[in-house]
Amino acid sequence: MKLGEIQRIAVLGSGTMGPGIAQSYAMGGYEVLLYDISKPALDKARGMLLANLDTYVQEDLLPVEEADGIYRRITFTNKLSKALDGVQFVQETVAENPGVKRSVFEQVDAMVSPETIVVSNASSLNPFELVPESRKANFAAAHWFAPPQILPLVEVAKGEKTSKETMETVLTLLRACGKTPVRLEKYVPGYIINRIQILLNTEVFYLLENGICTPEQLDLAVKASLMPRGMVLGLVQRYDFTGLDISANNIMNGSYVMPETSRHPAALFDHVDKGELGIKTGKGFYDYGGRSREELC
């Protein structure tokens, strides 16, 4: 499947990521069918999309007419057969459950043409182990980041049987939608960013649990150093600007010892146990004062 053959895109799953991903494809000019088995989930997705587009208009990022056109290009449906009718590209973003994803992949494989490209937003699961053998040449991982309508990165990983044409089409399509796809030559659990994030999580929870700083001070430190520098140099090029000899010396002579990784950090799970789940409940590490998710996003 080549880029010019793609006109209709199905986005399967309207949870946390689906609405923003659907918006991104629609902003690229494609007709999008957003599917979820749950009508309430679709109603919520519709509200999120309208709020997102209204924000773009209010911030002068889009004229009203263009925002209306983007919204009109998205169809909401709770019927999988309708979502897959005549599509050339399928973006899966259903629950992170192997049984659910495997079932969806099997249904998709049976309902779309052999040439249709299917990509997965799986984060903690290996999607290449769940997709039918018959689809593997036209299958890739396309891992987005929240909020997907804003953050440009999409990590695109190939499987052992992913065709060269499929990879090129996925990468080109994402660029056409204004995204920044980063190509991984093979799948690795966590892709790039989540692997780095796991290491950061270890330090974040260590610092919070030991009372070394507050969440606000930790975030301030990162925003005032790592993030602005990272926008320019990333993580690897920074070593070149520091000097590889200096970096090597710092590693050899440093007194820092990384804390042990915990799969149940108290700094996180204490909030979870109290039902403080972040913006979805109005409180997490920060207190959002009763503001809704739509107001905050």
Give short role names for the model-derived ranges.
Residues 41-44, 58-117, 124-126:
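Rossmann-like NAD(P)-binding element
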Residues 1-55, 59, 111:
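NAD(P)+-binding Rossmann beta1-loop-alpha1 motif at the extreme N-terminus of oxidoreductases
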Residues 117-186, 190-194:
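Rossmann-fold dinucleotide-binding core
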